[in-house]
Amino acid sequence: MDWDQLELHPRIIAAVRRDLQRLTGLSRSDVQQLLTAAATTCRRHPPTPALLLQRGECGGFKSDLRLSVGCPVLDELLRGGLPAGGITEVSGESGAGKTQLALQLCLSAQYPTEYRGLNSGAVYICTEDSFPNRRLQQLIREQSSLRTDVPPSLISSLQFSDHIYIEHAADLVVLYLQDSLQVCLSRRVPLLLARGLVRLLVVDSVAALFRAEFQAADWLERSKQLITFSSTLHHLSQEFTTPVLCINQVTDVFSSSDDSLGPLSSSVSPALGLVWANQVMVRLMMRRLQGTVARGNQSSALRRLEVVFAPHLARDGRDAAVWREGVRGVQT
């Protein structure tokens, strides 16, 4: 793509060229190269029409490019699983089961494509607590109970722990002023993706990156950082046809008005507002309900996974529970 292909008035383009030459001292040909590079970066991928998304005619929405959750009930809700393109957000209160679902997807990604996996590993970026390795090991041991559709010999042959790459990030100051996250997303993650070592990127949680370090008056700077961060995620997802899963926190809702970006029935709303919501392609909400369900010698608080918005999914939900082997939908 060339700079002249952008929909700008010719006088504006000419003024930009003159100003760049004056401010930088570059030659006219160098300025032209700079503008071409900027135009290419700003619009690396063409926009995707919503009609094509609904028809499933775009790369990340092809039926063979879905990442299974590992549960038929939840896969039915998501029409096969997570699309292998764009940002999927799972938000919810503490203890709702968001991290449980993320860990389960990290394991599901390692199965061959015939079992609705991605035949590759995952990158897991922790921004709050330490990585829940003990729970991961339990999920690995119980895979044969969860994935009854997969031959036990195949499950035992997979080295799940060796293909989950864990990155720790503390806060936004460290991430952006010292380039910790930027180095991770612009160097290490693309290298793993290019080598085929990973095919899933998880950020747990995105809200922790932006809520602690900004006051209310810093909303403009926070918005810029959010857009920069999400732009990097979108680029990785589109470049490598990779699902990106972002765990998000929630905030209380005090308004009685109907919020189309919120869950079907809840007094909370995903954090980070409209700026972040506009970057998300699929928004899911996990809620912890009243009551418990029992199975054998196990019991679990009842949860519900809801589709808040998605270009290819109806607003719907399924009850679920967290067992030793992972998150399963509850048949009602």
Region locations from a protein language model:
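The Walker A/P-loop phosphate-binding site
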Residues: 10-11, 15, 19-24, 30-151, ...
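Phosphate-binding/switch region of NTP-binding enzymes
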Residues: 224-227, 231, 235-332
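Amphipathic alpha-helical transducer elements in NTP-driven molecular machines
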Residues: 71, 84, 99-100, 133, ...
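Conserved, well-folded catalytic cores of nucleic-acid-processing
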Residues: 37, 41-44, 80-81, 93, ...
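Short, intrinsically disordered, charge-balanced linker/junction segments flanking boundaries
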Residues: 3-16, 175
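Conserved beta-strand elements of beta-rich interaction domains across eukaryotes
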Residues: 95, 129-130, 171-173, 207-208, ...
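Hydrophobic/aromatic beta-strand patches that form the interior of the parallel beta-sheet core
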Residues: 88, 123-125, 165-167, 245, ...
